Amino acid sequence: MTHQTHAYHTVNPSPWPLTGALSALLMTSGLIMWFHFNSPLLLVLGLTTNFLTMYQWWRDIIRESTFQGHHTTIVQKGLRYGMILFIVSEVFFFAGFFWAFYHSSLAPTPELGGCWPPTGINPLNPLEVPLLNTSVLLASGVSITWAHHSLMEGHRKHMLQALFITIALGVYFTLLQASEYYEAPFTISDGIYGSTFFVATGFHGLHVIIGSSFLIVCFMRQLKFHFTSSHHFGFEAAAWYWHFVDVVWLFLYVSIYWWGS
């Protein structure tokens, strides 16, 4: 290996961005095939390649950061900026859904009956499952903060307990959301109300699943003593993402479930 005279990490060539892009193509194409032709083959192939890519890319990053020491202070600074920019891009992603919702609801057209919710739509009660979901996510925000403070203070056991509680609450939220979808009195094809509701809450649910995956990886890493009180950016990034998911849900609840009903 050649001598390195700088603190930056020169990454070796990696196939995972390419396989990740391929899995994204397969998943989106697979969704279309599943929706229109009832054929899940491409979707299953896309999900499989996506899981394999995630596993191997995470493995490489953990090896580089924890075992090879490539994540120096200056590298971590770059990763922080990258995570912040990623979350900002996600804010604008969800802003598009809120724009679509408010554009449709603040000035309902005659085709909708001139009212919101549109004529014939029976909205969900915001004080039932949606309120429970809000409580669950707020509680998970508290537990992830507990985990973070425990880690910084060197209380490994407390950190693991708090992180496990956060993961359990995330899974519980996903199950509640799935049951709500199953029992909803309207579908995604029921006009602008159904499409904005299911796309906005569905993408949020997907982000909860992604965030839960991040936290599960952090939990397994902490079981193997990968994090210290001063070197734990992998966990910190996952915590930032989880707080972002919390805040988006609060806006969804107030806008779509409470005001929109």
Swiss-Prot record:
Enzyme type, top EC level: translocase
Mitochondrial matrix side: 1-15, 67-72, 153-155, 224-232
Any one GO molecular-function label of the UniProt entry: cytochrome-c oxidase activity
Residue spans crossing the bilayer: 16-34, 41-66, 73-105, 129-152, 156-183, 191-223, 233-256
Organism (species): Dasypus novemcinctus (Nine-banded armadillo)
Protein task: Component of the cytochrome c oxidase, the last enzyme in the mitochondrial electron transport chain which drives oxidative phosphorylation. The respiratory chain contains 3 multisubunit complexes succinate dehydrogenase (complex II, CII), ubiquinol-cytochrome c oxidoreductase (cytochrome b-c1 complex, complex III, CIII) and cytochrome c oxidase (complex IV, CIV), that cooperate to transfer electrons derived from NADH and succinate to molecular oxygen, creating an electrochemical gradient over the inner membrane that drives transmembrane transport and the ATP synthase.
Membrane topology: Multi-pass membrane protein
Annotated GO biological process: mitochondrial electron transport, cytochrome c to oxygen; respiratory chain complex IV assembly
Topology, Mitochondrial intermembrane side: 35-40, 106-128, 184-190, 257-261
PROSITE patterns, alphabetized: COX3
InterPro entries assigned: Cyt_c/ubiquinol_Oxase_su3, Cyt_c_oxase_su3_dom, Cyt_c_oxidase-like_su3, Cyt_c_oxidase_su3-like_sf, Cyt_c_oxidase_su3_a-hlx
Pfam family, one: COX3
Full protein name: Cytochrome c oxidase subunit 3
Gene Ontology CC terms: mitochondrial inner membrane; respiratory chain complex IV
Enzyme Commission number(s): 7.1.1.9
Main location as per UniProt: mitochondrion
Quaternary structure and interacting proteins, as annotated: Component of the cytochrome c oxidase (complex IV, CIV), a multisubunit enzyme composed of 14 subunits. The complex is composed of a catalytic core of 3 subunits MT-CO1, MT-CO2 and MT-CO3, encoded in the mitochondrial DNA, and 11 supernumerary subunits COX4I, COX5A, COX5B, COX6A, COX6B, COX6C, COX7A, COX7B, COX7C, COX8 and NDUFA4, which are encoded in the nuclear genome.
Position of the signal peptide: none
Subcellular localization: Mitochondrion inner membrane
Family, similarity comment: Belongs to the cytochrome c oxidase subunit 3 family.
Known catalytic reactions: 4 Fe(II)-[cytochrome c] + O2 + 8 H(+)(in) = 4 Fe(III)-[cytochrome c] + 2 H2O + 4 H(+)(out)
